[in-house]
Amino acid sequence: MANIKSAKKRAVQSEKHRLHNASRRSMVRTFVRKVYNAILTQDKKAAQQAFSAMQPIVDRQASKGLIHKNKAARYKSHLITQINKMH
């Protein structure tokens, strides 16, 4: 454990940020999973609605640096391709 006051403060802040980021990361994964599940059930309308809900969440977290912008782009590209393949 840290001995210096500022190091102790940073340790507390780091833990707080870690928990906050874990929550946000989980939220992103949940939204992506909802789109995947809609694709698996072959429900195009539900998949499009889930994608519309997921897209701003993923973009917002990418802009804040929680996930890399290329990863956000990859999520969106892969999912919209899968949705467009549905008939």
Swiss-Prot record:
Residues 1-25 are annotated as: Disordered. Belongs to the bacterial ribosomal protein bS20 family. This is Small ribosomal subunit protein bS20. NCBIfam families: S20. Keywords: Ribonucleoprotein, Ribosomal protein, RNA-binding, rRNA-binding. PANTHER family: 30S RIBOSOMAL PROTEIN S20, SMALL RIBOSOMAL SUBUNIT PROTEIN BS20C. InterPro entries: Ribosomal_bS20 (IPR002583), Ribosomal_bS20_sf (IPR036510). The lineage of its organism: Bacteria, Pseudomonadati, Pseudomonadota, Gammaproteobacteria, Candidatus Palibaumannia. Binds directly to 16S ribosomal RNA. The keyword Ligase does not apply. GO terms for biological process: translation. It comes from the Bacteria. The gene is rpsT. GO terms for cellular component: cytosol; small ribosomal subunit. The keyword Oxidoreductase does not apply. GO terms for molecular function: small ribosomal subunit rRNA binding; structural constituent of ribosome.
